[in-house]
């Protein structure tokens, strides 16, 4: 049996009462008594446990005492039913009286808890045992309820709403859990100024993502705690509203609005003591709106206008425009505070302020040069994000990487471990051998193993010692930080004795320990070769930038410097002749990697001019293969596809309102994903002249704005354009160097006739490719044969051509007008097809060497090398 009329109770209170018969049955009791209700309330983990915690009681102790009392009651083995006991009946009557005292409409959990104070059967004794008086209980209930009344059947969601749906930033600042905020004084001062107004005292922080809007609110919280604010803001609480928690779990219509109203009521009832901070304030507009329902923004409006609610908002420029500007009534209630991206110098100061926090967290040191590098390199190479966020991320990731290296086994030790494993496997197999040579080898191996194991244990001991000291340093630094926070708290509370005791006692001792640990680490590192690095340097930051963007930022390693010095030779392995073109491209790369290129323009921009088939596109491919080890790093755009005026939208993206607007452009998307690339615009004369207007910004400033309004950075690209314009003039003077300048002028005239001067004027160099000579064609034959050889290597077939065969192919494939392409066709016809047929006939097998020569009939002959050897 249960008490009647659930409509008198709130949902949670009725759920607790409805659970009591089950608990009584489990305990084999026939009567429902007050102890069963207490057990039910404690099982809920809801308001009852909150009240006891607020009153300073141990919930677990109350649970244990309740269970103990229940277990002592007489049991009935098979109770036919359960009946309402006297104690519970009286308790419910007292709860009804408590409801009337509080002026509520329903009996709630707190009324039931309060009724236990007068319960003669169980409650009084329980509260005596745990030392809880009715007065303390009432105070705890009052603190949780605040000024809320029970006006519906689900009031618990509205109690201590700010505690549930907000983070107290001032409390976090007192505990030292917020990162220090450096600079931003003007913005914080403006926020304080707006908050001090009589009406419309609501600043909204607007700025790009990552510039530090939330940090300004945290900075204000720190100032409030440090009492570095005007009297109007002294001892105020700054609470960040968690919109996610507010919306989460609001199942019924109107539940979200009720929660928000409860939060706003607490704020207004505090008479200006509480300042609300809503991060991502645009989420408030439209939040909780269903058909015909008010959204959260409309609930805020009246209070914002009257000055009852002091609220700081933060949102990005785009979202402010999209959501808040559309709602003019909401917009006028907020005063805008623009937060700009800090300069590189300011970012360095911010990083210096945060340095200690990151050092303590990761347990590594961060050098000042690393901080400067993080600010300068991120500003230069990461264009789609904002300072200081991107610089802080760099430092954080570099420190995390170093910490990971410290905790994992050093490379030297790892190599020795592998070597020992290898030798032990060899020893096992040698032990089974009986020959004298095997025994000698075994003896030698045993000696080698003993030496290696000795070295292994020495390195292991050193690694553990270094790691131990580094960990100790981290724990001492953490201790120092805790003591510093305690000192600040003592000074704020004017407990100067405690502050002095900590400052001149504990802190001095910790600094002494820190100095000792640092000296010990230096001793280990200087005495023996150091296995671990414990400091983040400029090189670490450069490495992280390279991982993020693919741009080689790190200082040149000697091997890479040598590789760059021989860049021309590398390119000539693929591109025959064309010395001017190859050296111009090589010099541009050398300038860039040595750090002498103009940082505000592309690395280099070229127009390759010349007849077809002389190596213009091949040079671009060779360059991409050299720089990125793959030809696929070449962003190739065939300009013959851009013959119409409107085709430019394919490069930078379709304008708003057109199909494909969200997809971005072929060129801009490729460079956003891979900012360090070789961009090849093939056959530029085929494109519509208006398409080249896009190139003006790319070539001059190294950037272009796509259809979405994003700036795409071309400063780390090499731009190569190829064209056949004027190729007839180049062919006319083939092999005649004396007429070169005349030919160059005529080609440039043809270019000027076709392209606009403002486009041509922005290109770094015009490089003319000459038509190929016969001796160069022989080299190309050898290159093409090498490629064919690679394809045959899968079948282990080797290809060998005599000098006569090479001359024959060069002669057949020579055509000055078409360059090297006819040669490719000749090799296909004269060499590849006959070999393919011979393999299919079974003339050649895997592992054969095919000798290619010119037969008496002036055609290529094919035979096995082995046959030749036996003749």
Curated annotation (Swiss-Prot):
CDD domains: AAA, RecA-like_ClpB_Hsp104-like. Residues 392-526 form a coiled coil. It is found in: Cytoplasm. GO terms for molecular function: ATP binding; ATP hydrolysis activity. Keywords: ATP-binding, Chaperone, Coiled coil, Cytoplasm, Nucleotide-binding, Repeat, Stress response. Residues 9-73 are annotated as: Repeat 1. Residues 772-871 are annotated as: C-terminal. Residues 84-147 are annotated as: Repeat 2. The keyword Transmembrane helix does not apply. Residues 560-771 are annotated as: NBD2. SUPFAM superfamilies: Double Clp-N motif, P-loop containing nucleoside triphosphate hydrolases. ATP 1 binds at residues 207-214. The keyword Coiled coil applies. Gene3D superfamilies: 1.10.8.60, Clp, N-terminal domain, P-loop containing nucleotide triphosphate hydrolases. One of its GO terms (cellular component) is cytoplasm. GO terms for biological process: cellular response to heat; protein refolding. Residues 6-147 form the Clp R domain. ATP 2 binds at residues 610-617. Residues 342-550 are annotated as: Linker. PANTHER family: ATP-DEPENDENT CLP PROTEASE, HEAT SHOCK PROTEIN 104. Part of a stress-induced multi-chaperone system, it is involved in the recovery of the cell from heat-induced damage, in cooperation with DnaK, DnaJ and GrpE. Acts before DnaK, in the processing of protein aggregates. Protein binding stimulates the ATPase activity; ATP hydrolysis unfolds the denatured protein aggregates, which probably helps expose new hydrophobic binding sites on the surface of ClpB-bound aggregates, contributing to the solubilization and refolding of denatured protein aggregates by DnaK. Homohexamer. The oligomerization is ATP-dependent. The Clp repeat (R) domain probably functions as a substrate-discriminating domain, recruiting aggregated proteins to the ClpB hexamer and/or stabilizing bound proteins. The NBD2 domain is responsible for oligomerization, whereas the NBD1 domain stabilizes the hexamer probably in an ATP-dependent manner. The movement of the coiled-coil domain is essential for ClpB ability to rescue proteins from an aggregated state, probably by pulling apart large aggregated proteins, which are bound between the coiled-coils motifs of adjacent ClpB subunits in the functional hexamer. This is Chaperone protein ClpB 1. It comes from Thermosynechococcus vestitus (strain NIES-2133 / IAM M-273 / BP-1).
């Amino acid at each position: 049996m249960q008490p009647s009329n659930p409509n008198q109770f709130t949902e949670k209170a009725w759920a607790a009462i409805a659970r009591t018969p089950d608990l009584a049955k489990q305990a084999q009791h026939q009567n429902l008594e007050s102890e069963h209700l207490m057990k039910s309330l404690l099982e809920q983990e809801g308001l009852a446990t909150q009240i006891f915690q607020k009153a300073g009681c141990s919930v677990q102790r109350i649970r244990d005492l309740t269970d103990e009392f229940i277990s002592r009651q007489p049991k009935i083995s098979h109770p036919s039913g359960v009946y309402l006991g006297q104690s519970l009946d009286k308790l419910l009557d007292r709860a009804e009286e408590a409801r009337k005292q509080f002026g509520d409409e329903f009996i709630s959990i707190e009324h039931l808890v309060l009724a236990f104070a007068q319960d003669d059967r169980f409650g009084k004794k329980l509260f005596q045992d745990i030392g809880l008086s009715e007065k303390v209980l009432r105070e705890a209930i009052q603190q949780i309820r605040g000024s809320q009344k029970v006006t519906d059947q689900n009031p618990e969601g509205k109690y201590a709403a700010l505690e549930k749906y907000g983070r107290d930033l001032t409390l976090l600042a007192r505990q030292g859990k917020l990162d220090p905020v450096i600079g931003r004084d003007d913005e914080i001062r403006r926020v304080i100024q707006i908050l001090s107004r009589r009406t419309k005292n609501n600043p909204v922080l607007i700025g790009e993502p990552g510039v530090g809007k939330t940090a300004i609110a945290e900075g204000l919280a720190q100032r409030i705690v440090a009492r570095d604010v005007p009297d109007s803001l002294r001892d105020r609480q700054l609470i960040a509203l968690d919109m996610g928690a507010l919306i989460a779990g609001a199942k019924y219509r109107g539940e979200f609005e009720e929660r928000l109203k409860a939060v706003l009521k607490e704020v207004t009832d505090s008479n200006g003591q509480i300042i609300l901070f809503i991060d991502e304030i645009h989420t408030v507009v439209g939040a909780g709106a269903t058909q015909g329902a008010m959204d959260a923004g409309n609930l805020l409006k009246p209070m914002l206008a009257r000055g009852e609610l002091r609220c700081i908002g933060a949102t990005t420029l785009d979202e402010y425009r999209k959501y808040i500007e559309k709602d003019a009534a909401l917009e006028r209630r907020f005063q805008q505070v623009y937060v700009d991206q800090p300069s590189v110098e300011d970012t360095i100061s911010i990083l210096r302020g945060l340095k200690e926090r990151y050092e303590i967290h990761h347990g590594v040191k961060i050098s000042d040069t690393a901080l400067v590098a993080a600010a300068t390199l991120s500003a230069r190479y990461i264009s789609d994000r904002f300072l200081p966020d991107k610089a802080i991320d760099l430092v954080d990731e570099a420190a995390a990487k170093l910490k990971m290296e410290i905790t994992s086994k050093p490379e030297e030790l790892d190599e020795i471990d592998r070597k020992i494993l290898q030798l032990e496997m060899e020893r096992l197999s040698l032990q089974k051998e009986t020959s004298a040579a095997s025994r000698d080898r075994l003896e030698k191996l045993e000696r080698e193993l003993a030496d290696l194991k000795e070295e292994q244990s020495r390195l292991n001991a050193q690694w553990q010692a270094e790691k131990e000291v580094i960990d100790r340093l981290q724990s001492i630094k953490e201790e120092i930080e805790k003591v510093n926070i305690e000192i600040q708290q003592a000074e704020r509370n004017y407990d100067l004795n405690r502050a002095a005791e900590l400052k001149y006692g504990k802190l001095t001792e910790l600094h002494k320990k820190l100095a000792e640990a640092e000296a010990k680490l230096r001793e280990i590192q200087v005495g023996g070769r150091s296995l671990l690095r414990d400091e983040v340097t400029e090189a670490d930051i450069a490495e992280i930038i390279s991982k993020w963007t693919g741009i080689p930022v790190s200082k040149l390693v000697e091997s890479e410097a040598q590789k760059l010095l021989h860049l021309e030779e590398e390119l000539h392995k693929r591109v025959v002749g064309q010395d001017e073109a190859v050296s111009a491209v090589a010099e541009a790369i050398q300038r860039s990697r040595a750090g002498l290129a103009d940082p505000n323009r592309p690395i280099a921009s070229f127009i390759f001019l010349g007849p077809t088939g002389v190596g213009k596109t091949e040079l671009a491919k060779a360059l991409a293969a050299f720089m990125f080890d793959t030809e696929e790093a070449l962003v190739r755009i065939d300009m013959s596809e851009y013959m119409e005026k409107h085709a430019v939208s394919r490069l930078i993206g379709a304008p708003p309102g057109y199909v494909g607007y969200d997809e971005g452009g072929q060129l801009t998307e490729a460079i956003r994903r891979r900012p360090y690339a070789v961009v090849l615009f093939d056959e530029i004369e085929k494109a519509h002249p208006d398409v080249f207007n896009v190139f003006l910004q790319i070539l001059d400033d190294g950037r272009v704005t796509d259809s979405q309004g994003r700036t795409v950075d071309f400063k780390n690209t090499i731009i190569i354009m190829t064209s056949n314009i004027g190729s007839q003039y180049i062919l006319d003077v083939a092999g005649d160097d004396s007429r070169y300048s005349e030919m160059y002028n005529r080609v440039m005239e043809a270019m000027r006739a076709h392209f606009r001067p403002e486009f041509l004027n922005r290109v770094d160099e015009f490089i003319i490719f000459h038509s190929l000579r016969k001796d160069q064609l022989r080299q190309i034959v050898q290159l093409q044969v090498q490629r064919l050889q690679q394809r045959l290597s899968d079948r282990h077939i080797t290809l060998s051509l005599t000098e006569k065969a090479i001359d024959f192919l060069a002669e057949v494939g020579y055509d000055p007008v078409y360059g090297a392409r006819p040669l490719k066709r000749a090799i296909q016809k004269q060499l590849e097809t006959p070999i393919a047929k011979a393999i299919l006939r079974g003339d050649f097998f895997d592992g054969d060497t095919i000798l290619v020569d010119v037969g008496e009939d002036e055609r290529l002959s094919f035979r096995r090398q082995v046959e030749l050897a036996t003749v």
